[in-house]
Amino acid sequence: MNIQTTVEPTSAERAEKLQGMGCKRKRVEDIRFTQGKGNYVDDVKLPGMLFGDFVRSSHAHARIKSIDTSKAKALPGVFAVLTAADLKPLNLHYMPTLAGDVQAVLADEKVLFQNQEVAFVVAKDRYVAADAIELVEVDYEPLPVLVDPFKAMEPDAPLLREDIKDKMTGAHGARKHHNHIFRWEIGDKEGTDATFAKAEVVSKDMFTYHRVHPSPLETCQCVASMDKIKGELTLWGTFQAPHVIRTVVSLISGLPEHKIHVIAPDIGGGFGNKVGAYSGYVCAVVASIVLGVPVKWVEDRMENLSTTSFARDYHMTTELAATKDGKILAMRCHVLADHGAFDACADPSKWPAGFMNICTGSYDMPVAHLAVDGVYTNKASGGVAYRCSFRVTEAVYAIERAIETLAQRLEMDSADLRIKNFIQPEQFPYMAPLGWEYDSGNYPLAMKKAMDTVGYHQLRAEQKAKQEAFKRGETREIMGIGISFFTEIVGAGPSKNCDILGVSMFDSAEIRIHPTGSVIARMGTKSQGQGHETTYAQIIATELGIPADDIMIEEGNTDTAPYGLGTYGSRSTPTAGAATAVAARKIKAKAQMIAAHMLEVHEGDLEWDVDRFRVKGLPEKFKTMKELAWASYNSPPPNLEPGLEAVNYYDPPNMTYPFGAYFCIMDIDVDTGVAKTRRFYALDDCGTRINPMIIEGQVHGGLTEAFAVAMGQEIRYDEQGNVLGASFMDFFLPTAVETPKWETDYTVTPSPHHPIGAKGVGESPHVGGVPCFSNAVNDAYAFLNAGHIQMPHDAWRLWKVGEQLGLHV
């Protein structure tokens, strides 16, 4: 007689089956992407759809004397040619920016940067549209050009923004010059100045963080379709923040939000480039409303690099006051911020310079003062958070370079200087001198682990030997050791200090369990490659005990998703991830009531075990979450409404503060300027780790972009405002050939105020990577007394450094 018994899986076995938090779950979205079955904006094809293209200015600053569109309109296949004159009667010739400025949709009377939009041609296909734009005749009167932000603030500098020349008070106080945008100050100026006045050592440098540009695989694009019968507009687009775009379109067009349906399908990368609104979106909407047919706009790569939102262009005069033995007493920083022709920064309204006031970094100092002046120039507008959280990259670059130059002046090892000044674990939560309250951290532990792993002291000994060999003429190669210890600020953000256009920067999650136990969750964020469909499901799997494979995540549809502020600045996990956990716990609390009813016990007699509620002391008496889901729809307890679903709008109590220790070992040939990264080690602490494999992918991607920015990327202009490098022939994008090998590591310091302890990680490798590369280059040349070497550190610039130092024979 065979007796078969069923062995109940252990808690560990059931937890492993869930593929919840901490599991290296493969990205579920990659199945469609790797098979070429993604659904992108350019895949949207509608009956009768037309195509739009822009006539763009060849001048950086010029008055428009006339625009003749007659030849273009006469071309067969052309349906409309829109200019500012056509938009004015609709009050659509200007649009609000996320920074509170107004930006011309189509240039009105004069152009302010090269390739600015002048007219919008609508034709039967993109080829006819391209032909038509060549037939539009624009008569320009060139005006003096300003591309240097310092010259733009000189008393006799030409006026750029004639549309606001009489508005000398902005959202952040008085404008002290007609090209001035804002002056923003924070910190104890009096106390900081007093500390500097009596400091034993003052280290002062000017660090320029050059203009760069996010380079997503997919450019910005949209399809607008107006249903005149219903009075409803559907807008597909590459939107990192679909609900924000819906609000902006409503404000511009006058259409109520319930009549606007915004859909962000699959997006091929964003990196901050797709947060704001662009002229292409507005013109496509207007053309669809006027013509009554769908209109598609897709920008090309040149347009993307030269006209959509740039990043950086910060000129930072940074000072540290210290004792002779290396104790930092104060920081003073003044920034001249080049915002281009319009202030279109994607920053929270109350922070015109973003979170630049994180610039005191990971270091304990009593006082600090920061002042930022924004200025208009004849460049494309922007100032987006390119792989960072609102100017944090600039802030970290400033403090990490300043630490290095202070160490050189003190003749002190820069690692020792950092350790001497770290915020200590027992000081958390730590109130930084410029206002942020750091949540948690163990900086000494992370630094020690990193130094031990790379063999820091052995590397310094090797470097010393190579320097002596170089002086003896035995080698033409120098060695640099770059260090970056960064603290980032992400998770924007708390309603008390973060909003965009007046909308608080909460985020949201709506979770519904079906009768059979499967789940659908809708989020207010929008992935552009971050892997949300995988990681949000893992959070829910852990919280509710339902396998991640039974959970579907939806984003990007404003008709179905709860209102959210989108994905950028590493905010998805700190905000929407928290909302997901809280919504799941609401469901779990209701499920516990149902379990108590079914098991005929009090709720307090139950305990949670991976995927079930069981009676305390009687583990054989339990109800799984799937059983409870079925019961919730078919036999709920009396006076309890059916179903298991919840929504949460999460307003974070604070930001989260991921941190990391990065080391770069670099070898540079002084005769050619060619720099080779021998080793790059990145230790990140992002709090609770949801999916280690996705974290590693994020770190690899961020470091690759950091390598590109530090070692070659730059959007340059000549004196006439001509863009130099608006293609990938000139704008450096590293391939697998150039990209170094990345070595990743971690510590775990959970955020005490976040529901699952997570902090965010997507931006950290870029934030920490850029100064690490730059510090490696500067460290290599330091023994030759080269002084600060500005980025980007391409071979031509490093060859010039060697030439200036007299190293070439």
Curated annotation (Swiss-Prot):
Reaction catalysed by this enzyme: CO + a quinone + H2O = a quinol + CO2
Enzyme Commission code(s) on record: 1.2.5.3
Key words, A-Z: Copper, Metal-binding, Molybdenum, Oxidoreductase, Plasmid
Pfam families reported for this sequence: Ald_Xan_dh_C (PF01315), MoCoBD_1 (PF02738), MoCoBD_2 (PF20256)
Residues given in the record as Cu(+) binding sites: 388
Cofactor section: Cu(+); Mo-molybdopterin cytosine dinucleotide
Cofactor: record remark: Binds 1 Cu(+) ion per subunit.
Stretches that traverse the bilayer: none
Binding sites annotated in the UniProt record for Mo-molybdopterin cytosine dinucleotide: 763
Keyword Oxidoreductase: yes
Metal-binding found in the keyword field: yes
GO molecular function per UniProt: anaerobic carbon-monoxide dehydrogenase activity; carbon-monoxide oxygenase activity; copper ion binding; iron ion binding; molybdenum ion binding
Function text: Catalyzes the oxidation of carbon monoxide to carbon dioxide.
Oligomer status and interactors: Dimer of heterotrimers. Each heterotrimer consists of a large, a medium and a small subunit.
NCBIfam families, sorted: CO_dehy_Mo_lg
Annotated protein name in UniProt: Carbon monoxide dehydrogenase large chain
Species in which this protein is naturally found: Afipia carboxidovorans (strain ATCC 49405 / DSM 1227 / KCTC 32145 / OM5)
